Amino acid sequence: MRRLAWTAFLICAFCSPRPAAASGTLALHDCRLEHPLKVTSLAARCGVLQVAENPAEPLGRTIGLHVAVVPALNRRSRAAPLFLLAGGPGQAASDLYVSYAAAFARVNRTHDIVLLDQRGTGQSEPLFCDYPEDWRETHDELPALRQATLACLARYGERVRYYTSSVAALDLERVREALGYAQIDLYGASYGTRMAELYLRHHAAAVQAVVLDGVTYPEQAIGPQTPLDGERALDLILERCRYAPECAAAYPDLRREFDALRAKFGPGSACLTLPDPSTGEPLELEFDRGVLAAALRLLSYNATQASLLPALIHQASSGRPAALAAQTVMMAREIRGQLASGMQNSVVCSEDVPFFGGVDRQRLDATYQGTEQLDALAEICKLWPKGPVDTDLHAPLHSDVPTLLLSGEADPVTPPANARRLAQGLAHHRLLVLPGEGHGQLATGCMPRLVAAFLDARDAQALDAACLEEHRPAPFFVGSTGPAP
């Protein structure tokens, strides 16, 4: 479970894809897309596109890319299809869609939705490493991480180097051609915004409109800034509690309690026995700075989860950290099952860690996350093969394609400042920032309607976003029963 402290977040029947897709060369068949937690499944049309694992050796080993098309409900619509680019890195586009299908329902009225499980994820030659939940319990952390990484490489070999974003962007273009689409729209979430920017840089003529949700910008090497962004987000959450009358009344000393909690579990730890959230069986857990950091970061990801933080911090500071620990176990397990950690290693070790430059460790150590994530990444990347990366991957992006940027004010990993940085090179864009919200805005409030309207008109400035002024983040829990009535 501790490994995830640094890693890391409707049924409809269809007959056939619309004519634009039918003109392609990729054969599709009826299929169902299953929710990652097995709670539902959706109908689609699926196919497998065979591509070279190493693009420099077209006659070498091939892999199958899993592609799913959810046809537009209006079969006569000629709107461009929307390609979904998932986050992580390591999440499958099919998992993203099934989890948020309701948020895409308006778009799907007139747009095909295309789901390419990026190479190394989902059903496209997934690369999962067996990093055990308890690798930190050896108290010999980095050697245990090295051992698990070497075991993963023994399973997959040197070929993991061919699972970078630059190679995946070539796959995306091949899928577009194989489906017969002349032009497409892009929706990228979190790491998926990097993929969208990379594709847009090299295939702008094929893109009509772009939605970026939880924005990265090309010049950014993801890693060193993450603890600082997480600290900023947590400060905003605690400050929001201070100005919310019910929360402030329930937890008048929340900041002091939080500071005391950090001081206690910085150098120290507590051995807990709590009911396993999945089985109810007794679960032994060493609660220390790493578990606390994982809890705070994961709970900060969206305002609904963040609504629990004041109550959980209060309980933990009062000597009852079990509820906070249980939340961490549940969220970490869910993420662990959905992120292909080997693919994540291939991306981060090739595209981010080599570009870290100077890291102010003293500044990072002052945050609740500290430098543990960076140390773990560095250890993995000493061993992990480096793959092909475009020379302009980290160059500024300049584009005149209509682009809608979505940010949460309290996003712990991709704050609004990222979107503002990217926007400097976008000729036709609009940034929507939701107060109090965290990572990923597509399913928030009236945002599904706004995204659909943007993709139909491709004019971000003309959007009437007044509905967002009525939105409020989830109220804080002020007791075991929930928010104040």
Question: What would you call each of these model-derived segments?
Answer:
Residues 7-16:
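Bacterial N-terminal signal peptides
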Residues 18-21:
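Sec/Tat signal peptide C-region and signal peptidase I cleavage site
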Residues 216-234, 312-317, 321-333:
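Flexible "cap/lid" loop of the alpha/beta hydrolase fold
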Residues 23-291, 346-485:
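Gly/Pro-rich cap/lid or specificity-loop segments adjacent to the active site
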Residues 300-314, 318, 354-359, 389:
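Short helix-capping/linker segments at secondary-structure and domain boundaries
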Residues 275-294, 301-304, 334-342:
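Structural motif
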